Design a protein with these regions (language model features):
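Non-catalytic signal-transmission and effector/linker regions of two-component phosphorelay proteins
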Residues: 1-13, 117-136
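Two-component/phosphorelay signaling modules centered on CheY-like receiver
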Residues: 21-39
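Acidic catalytic/metal-coordinating carboxylates
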Residues: 42-46, 69-73
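Conserved phosphotransfer cores of two-component systems
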Residues: 52-54, 76-84, 101-104
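Active-site beta3 strand of CheY-like receiver
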Residues: 54-60
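Receiver (REC) domain active-site loop signature in two-component systems and cognate sites
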Residues: 65
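Alpha4 helix (beta4-alpha4-beta5 surface) of REC/receiver domains from two-component response regulators
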Residues: 72, 93-110, 116-117, 121-124
Length: 136
């Protein structure tokens, strides 16, 4: 009987940022499947405006975007809310991780292509541990 309660606890309000609308739509569809509320932005400027207006449990951003890259967006978000979890989705994950320069403001990196399971893992890793401890 505890399963629905854990699922309800873990529902998040998530901001997804990607300059490719189809990627935003795909991520939104996957996250909606798990009961999360998702809003999308197609660039960093739009994302920052939305972030200022609303409280999000998590921000998921692409790395390679015009004007402001995902790590720059993450740093700008952390400057406003230091504890805000930020996950980055990128085709450049291995290159970025092996560069030796940690990405400021990024809590977790997902490699493209990705599956719903990768999103679930990222959400679990960056979320406060209260709901995970009950499972263990």
């Amino acid at each position: 009987m505890g399963m629905p309660k854990v699922a309800a606890l873990s529902r998040k309000r998530i901001l997804v940022v990607d300059d490719e609308p189809f990627v935003c739509d795909a991520v939104k569809m996957m996250l909606n499947f798990d009961g999360h509320t998702v809003e999308t932005a197609h660039n960093a400027k739009e994302a920052l405006a939305m972030f200022e207006e609303g409280k999000f449990d998590l921000v998921i951003t692409d790395f390679a975007m015009p004007a402001m890259k995902g790590d720059e967006l993450a740093a700008a978000i952390k400057a406003r809310a230091p504890n805000q979890p930020v996950v980055m989705i990128t085709a450049y994950a291995e290159m970025l991780q092996s560069s030796g320069n940690p990405l400021k403001g990024v809590d977790f990196i997902i490699s493209k292509p990705f599956l719903l399971e990768n999103l679930r893992e990222a959400i679990a890793k960056v979320s406060p541990s209260e709901s995970r401890e009950k499972d263990e």
